[in-house]
Curated annotation (Swiss-Prot):
Protein name: Probable beta-1,4-xylosyltransferase IRX10L
Glycosites: N142, N403
Lineage: Eukaryota, Viridiplantae, Streptophyta, Embryophyta, Tracheophyta
Gene Ontology, cellular component aspect: endosome; Golgi apparatus; Golgi medial cisterna; Golgi membrane; trans-Golgi network
Native source species: Arabidopsis thaliana
Positions on the Lumenal side per record topology: 23-415
């Protein structure tokens, strides 16, 4: 026992001496972000596209929010704030004939349980109803069957509209949205709920709340690995092998007693402050591969350790996530301590410099009011990069590609 304790002390001293260079302070010089699409985070979309916003009856959006204002602070709130942003954005046009894109403001995630969980079961019928409305009252949907339209679908599995992955896969993306561009938080390669051309965005995290918890920049990062959240979802996965594909359970079982890992199910009032004192923040998958932890880690300069195989991260065509985060395969979770302690200090320092770049943080947020370079502008930049539309977008007279009667029978009922 004494020998193992000595070995542990030696390892701890060795580890923390090797990271002393970046443990002293949270303050780091910034480094310019250069994404795979070029230096685009600071691009201004104004003048590059025009968006027409459909004026739908309030039952599709505003009345739903009036019924439950909690939706404003939910991690799916991007669908609400996107509409508000576009209504006052200089890219908006009131003349649909000059529009490059058409936006359909439908709030599909604002039907919440008493515990604040979204119930997406009515969403397919609501979406079908909205599409039928615009197809009947404007000519623009019918000329492309939605190929120059975009929708914000921020639910767990996007436009598959189910919170359980197996059932979401069985449903697939709503057939009427097959040609539209989907703006969604869900992103996983080779998954039926992420179609080609979708724009993956960060989940909503309240900017003002995070701002109010900032601590002095020179505060030491004295926590090596930090995580707060569920390891087991006993209520929905009693045997523990399905939730997070076992990755969270593996974190707990392997590292609950490791002094380098500050992990717990308890969510302290100092959660945001603790993230600012940490070097690495675990961002494992849950029921879906994404969560607000990624946004929080970036905002607080904590290197995100992404444990979610095949995840597609927000604005991946503009942000060099490989340079900013650490990716760990789900099967390699038992070796997490070795992986993280093996990263050279100079690599960690560079990741911290990239995270310190204000444009990186801004791209993760949906602030009110909007600010240059924020997530709203990154969505518009993503849409602008798709222009001009290919000729194949426009259908020949009388041509029909979508099947209006496809999908589950329950989805065809009037809403």
């Amino acid at each position: 026992m004494k020998l193992s304790s000595c070995v542990l002390i030696f390892l701890l001293c060795n580890t923390f001496s090797s990271i002393s260079a970046f443990r002293l302070s949270r303050s780091q010089p910034t480094e310019r972000i250069s994404g795979s699409a070029g230096d685009v985070l600071e691009d201004d979309p104004v003048g590059r596209l025009k968006v027409f916003v459909y004026e739908l009856p309030s039952k599709y959006n505003k009345k739903i929010l009036q019924k439950d204002p909690r939706c404003l602070n939910h991690m799916f709130a991007a669908e609400i704030y996107m509409q508000r942003f576009l209504l006052s954005s200089p890219v908006r046009t009131l003349n649909p004939e000059e529009a490059d894109w058409f936006y359909v403001p439908v709030y599909t995630t604002c039907d919440l349980t008493p515990n604040g969980l979204p119930l997406p079961f009515k969403s397919p019928r609501m979406m079908r109803s909205a599409i039928q409305l615009i197809a009947s009252n404007w000519p623009y949907w019918n000329r492309t069957e939605g190929a120059d339209h975009f929708f914000v679908v921020p639910h767990d599995f996007g436009a598959c509209f189910h919170y359980q992955e197996e059932k979401a896969i069985g449903r697939g993306i709503l057939p009427l949205l097959q040609r539209a561009t989907l703006v969604q938080t869900f992103g996983q390669r080779n998954h039926v709920c992420l179609k080609e051309g979708s724009i993956t965005v960060p989940p909503y995290a309240p900017p003002q709340k995070m701002q109010s918890h900032l601590i002095p920049e020179k505060t030491p990062r004295s926590i090596f690995v930090y995580f707060r959240g569920l390891f087991y979802d006993v209520g929905n996965d009693p045997e523990g092998g399905y939730y997070a594909r076992g990755a969270r359970a593996a974190v707990w079982e392997n590292f609950k007693d490791n002094p380098l890992f500050d992990i717990s199910t308890e969510h302290p009032t100092t959660y945001y402050e603790d993230m600012q004192r940490a070097i690495f923040c675990l961002c494992p998958l849950g029921w879906a591969p994404w969560s607000p932890r990624l946004v929080e880690a970036v905002i607080f300069g904590c290197i995100p350790v992404i444990i979610a195989d095949d995840i597609v991260l927000p604005f991946a065509d503009a942000i060099p996530w490989e340079d900013i985060g650490v990716f760990v395969d789900e099967k390699d979770v038992p070796y997490l301590d070795t992986i993280l302690t093996s990263i050279p200090p100079e690599v960690i320092l560079r990741k911290q410099r990239l995270l310190a770049n204000p444009s990186m943080k801004q791209a993760m947020l949906f602030p009110q009011p909007a600010q240059p370079g924020d997530a709203f502008h990154q969505v518009l930049n993503g849409l602008a990069r798709k222009l001009p539309h290919e000729r194949s977008v426009y259908l020949r007279p009388g041509e029909k590609l979508l099947n209006w009667t496809a999908g589950p029978v329950a989805d065809l009922k009037p809403w």
